């Protein structure tokens, strides 16, 4: 079954929830970037978090970029999500594997380190808006929760999970974002918090066949209402035409060097690792148009 998310609301219409099964898109990212376990967990969680944020905050042609700028061994992680629920991303150091924690789980916090989480929203205004918060946990879900509270003033709870198999394949990936709407009472918040704390590890649930609808019922109750079900996917908007335009911004001397010394050029998209080859003649055309 393809990856998808569901949007749900509780019976009182005071709690909004988005849940997602993202195994395929995280698997796609893992294969494209050849990530090892710790890098897979960090990139995967950031992709899921960015996807959930886009589903919660964006509309029409909006897009957002999440920058997880930790000082840990994986380096920076950047993901860009669109309102149509497509997402792309990359991690600075894809080949990081760390000793597991005592509970056997990947030490995501150690892989990430501290510093900053930034979210830039481009909503068609004159300037994109960037919110920045310190990395408070490094486990990523808590950091998204902190961002929503501080930068968006939205009381929320975020859960993110990626299960990496011993052979580096992705066994499961998914998550949720719960938002308290203005009418939510302290009692409701306490009850839903209790339900979330009682959940087994999210990876365990997804490995056992939990669907986004099932997860919504576990968190909001079986009387919750599913408002929407939408496909999600890893997708990059790079193209040879875009890279041709980038080449056209180079100095003529640089293009001439590529033509005369290298007899061509190969550009690689950092988000999806797609390769674009330009022949000598194609570079000459770029140079001609640039002049």
Curated annotation (Swiss-Prot):
InterPro entries: Heat_shock_Hsp33, Heat_shock_Hsp33_C, Heat_shock_Hsp33_N. CDD domains: Hsp33. Keywords: Chaperone, Cytoplasm, Disulfide bond, Redox-active center, Zinc. The keyword Zinc applies. One of its GO terms (biological process) is protein refolding. HAMAP family: HslO (MF_00117). Disulfide bonds join 236-238, 269-272. It holds the Pfam family HSP33. It is found in: Cytoplasm. Redox regulated molecular chaperone. Protects both thermally unfolding and oxidatively damaged proteins from irreversible aggregation. Plays an important role in the bacterial defense system toward oxidative stress. Its main location: cytoplasm. One of its GO terms (cellular component) is cytoplasm. Gene3D superfamilies: Hsp33 domain (3.55.30.10), HSP33 redox switch-like (3.90.1280.10). This is 33 kDa chaperonin. Belongs to the HSP33 family. GO terms for molecular function: protein folding chaperone; unfolded protein binding. The keyword Zinc applies. Under oxidizing conditions two disulfide bonds are formed involving the reactive cysteines. Under reducing conditions zinc is bound to the reactive cysteines and the protein is inactive. It comes from the Bacteria.
């Amino acid at each position: 079954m393809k990856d998808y998310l569901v949007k749900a609301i509780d019976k009182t219409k005071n709690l909004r929830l988005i849940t997602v099964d993202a195994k395929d898109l995280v698997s796609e990212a893992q294969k494209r970037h050849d990530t090892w376990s710790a890098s897979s967990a960090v990139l995967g969680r950031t992709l899921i978090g960015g996807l959930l944020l886009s589903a919660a905050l964006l509309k029409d042609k909006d897009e957002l970029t999440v920058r997880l700028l930790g000082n840990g061994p994986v380096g920076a992680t950047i993901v860009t999500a669109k309102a149509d629920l497509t997402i792309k991303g990359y991690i600075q150091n894809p080949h990081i594997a760390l000793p597991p924690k005592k509970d056997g789980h990947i030490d995501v916090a150690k892989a990430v380190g501290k510093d900053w989480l930034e979210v830039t929203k481009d909503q068609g205004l004159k300037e994109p808006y960037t919110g920045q918060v310190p990395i408070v946990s490094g486990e990523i879900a808590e950091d998204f929760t902190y961002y929503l509270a501080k930068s968006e003033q939205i009381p929320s709870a975020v859960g993110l999970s990626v299960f990496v198999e011993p052979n580096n394949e992705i066994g499961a990936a998914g998550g949720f974002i719960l938002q308290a709407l203005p009418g939510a009472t302290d009692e409701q918040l306490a009850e839903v918090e209790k339900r979330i704390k009682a959940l087994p590890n999210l990876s365990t649930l997804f490995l056992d066949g939990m669907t986004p609808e099932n997860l919504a019922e576990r968190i909001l109750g079986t009387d919750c209402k599913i408002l929407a079900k939408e496909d999600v996917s890893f997708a990059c908007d790079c193209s040879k035409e875009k890279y041709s335009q980038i080449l056209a911004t180079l100095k003529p001397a640089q293009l001439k060097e590529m033509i005369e010394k290298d007899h061509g050029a190969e550009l690689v998209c950092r988000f999806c690792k797609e390769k674009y080859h330009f022949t000598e003649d194609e570079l000459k055309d770029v140079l001609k148009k640039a002049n």
